[in-house]
Structure formats: structure tokens, C-alpha cells
Amino acid sequence: MENITFTSGLNSEMDANQPWRPWLSQTSRKAPDYKPYKRPADDEQHKLSIFKHPVKLFWPKSQCFDYLYEDAEVLLRNYPVQATICLYEDPDTEDEEDYSDEEDEKELR
């Protein structure tokens, strides 16, 4: 077989018997690395971020229906970052629920 070499075009400097394999790229054809989630180095960063994202605001479940619409709206309006409200169990509400369950059992007897 005859060895053909291209002198112009995409396959220049490549042998016709060897197909182009992009995963075996040369440094001249390699695009610069793009890292969208890379944090800037300290020397690049002018202002240190106070918040580490994602930001979660913990809100007690006992107040979720009573105050969520008014107080949470004010809290999120004054909070300088995008945040998610995460509900958590109050230690006080568990005692109240246990107490109410005991009362219900007494009433049923």
C-alpha cells in the first residue's frame, strides 16, 4: 500500500492509513480546560465569601403554619443570599405531642 500524507486541511500532518482519534489529541489541538465550578484561589478573590452555598435556614416545624408566611418572608427579604428553608422537629413539640397522645388514650378508656 502506498503511504499518502495530506499537506492541507483538517488532517494535515496525518497519515492516510491512521484515522484521526480525538482522544489522542495533540497539545496544539487541545482546547483550554473549562472548569465552571472551580473556586477561585485566595489571591484571585478580592472579597471572601461569608456564605457557603447551598445555604439552608432551619425553621421549627411547630411554627411552620403559624408564622411561615409572614416571618419567613421578612427573614428571606433581609437575608442577603438565596436560601432554602428546611423544617426541623422541635424538641418541645415532641413532648407536647406525647402529652396529647396520652390524653387521647385516657379519654378513650
UniProtKB/Swiss-Prot annotation:
Keywords: Developmental protein, Nucleus. A motif (WRPW motif) lies at residues 20-23. Residues 1-15 have a biased composition (Polar residues). GO terms for cellular component: nucleus. InterPro entries: Ripply_fam (IPR028127). Residues 53-88 are annotated as: Ripply homology domain. The keyword Nucleus applies. Residues 30-42 have a biased composition (Basic and acidic residues). Residues 1-42, 88-109 are annotated as: Disordered. First expressed in the paraxial mesoderm at the 90% epiboly stage, and subsequently confined to the presomitic mesoderm. Expressed in the rostral compartment of S-I and S-II. One of its GO terms (biological process) is somite rostral/caudal axis specification. Residues 89-109 have a biased composition (Acidic residues). It is found in: Nucleus. Plays a role in somitogenesis. Required for somite segregation and establishment of rostrocaudal polarity in somites. The ripply homology domain is required for transcriptional repression. Belongs to the ripply family. This is Protein ripply2. It comes from Danio rerio (Zebrafish). The lineage of its organism: Eukaryota, Metazoa, Chordata, Craniata, Vertebrata.
